[in-house]
A protein has these predicted regions:
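Short loop-to-alpha-helix "cap/lid" segments that border enzyme active sites
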Residues: 170-185
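Acidic interhelical loop/turn segments
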Residues: 148-154, 183-196
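Single conserved hydrophobic/aromatic residue that forms the stacking wall/gate
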Residues: 1-6, 10-11
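Short, charged/polar, low-complexity loop and linker segments
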Residues: 21-27, 114-116, 184-192
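Active-site-proximal alpha-helical scaffolds that flank and shape metal-associated catalytic sites
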Residues: 66-172, 203, 207
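Helix-loop segments that flank and shape redox-cofactor active sites
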Residues: 20-33, 49-68, 119
Length: 218
């Protein structure tokens, strides 16, 4: 984990960060149609996820929080989503095809859960729901950095999340989370009632991440 809060609320669930989908991708045994289905759904996911991060700007209490949230929105829209577009284009799947695809139920369940927290909760609620995706993919990048699948798009995917650029995104988000919790709850945030609530949110989002992988394997 990258942070103080992260060490308390860390991604330890191997059902997520070492899911069979990622294992198969890393050793070149994942069927390409499953990966393309995942990319399509993840593209739709990132559209909603970007909106949720935009809500983090609204929920922020200071300029530093706003800057990190805004930077994350930029990374999602202008870099991560572009990766999906470029990988899919190699297989004849256009940007229009991606945008007009139907969302799977697991995708809807996850993104709407996060957005609802963004609308109804405070920044800590929202960040706790967003953290498993950002930090989990960072952990996946570290775990599989040295794997070397022959399939180009699998290679490219692993390189993206293991890259210094993405790891820096994780560090910035972790720093945002740390400071946001300490600002609002104090140094002893683990002992607060709020901590119990946000842990439940974090764990729920982690389970929804696992469901997303399971959907991709169908």
């Amino acid at each position: 984990c990258w942070s103080l809060v992260g060490s308390e609320m860390c991604i330890r669930d191997s059902l997520y960060t070492k899911h069979d989908f990622v294992n198969k991708l890393s050793n070149d045994t994942l069927k390409e149609e499953k990966f393309l289905h995942y990319l399509t759904q993840d593209y739709l996911f990132l559209i909603q996820f970007s909106k949720a991060w935009a809500l983090a700007i609204l929920k922020s209490d200071n300029l530093e929080e706003m800057k990190i949230a805004a930077s994350t929105v930029n990374d999602l829209i202008n870099f991560e989503m572009e990766l999906h577009i470029s990988l899919c284009a190699n297989y004849g799947i256009s940007k229009s095809d991606l945008e007009n695809a139907d969302e799977e139920n697991q995708n809807i369940a996850y993104t709407r859960y996060v957005l609802e927290l963004g609308y109804s909760g405070d920044l800590l609620d929202l960040l706790s729901s967003l953290a498993p995706c950002v930090l989990g993919y960072g952990e996946i990048g570290i775990n599989y950095k040295n794997s070397n699948p022959k399939t180009h798009m699998y290679q490219k995917w692993i390189q993206t999340y293991s890259s210094n650029e993405y790891q820096d995104v994780c560090k910035n988000v972790a720093n945002l989370i740390d400071k946001a919790f300490i600002l609002r709850l104090g140094d002893d945030f683990v002992g607060t009632y709020k901590w119990q609530k946000v842990n439940k949110i974090f764990n729920k989002s982690t389970l929804l991440e696992i469901d997303f992988w399971n959907m991709a394997m169908k």
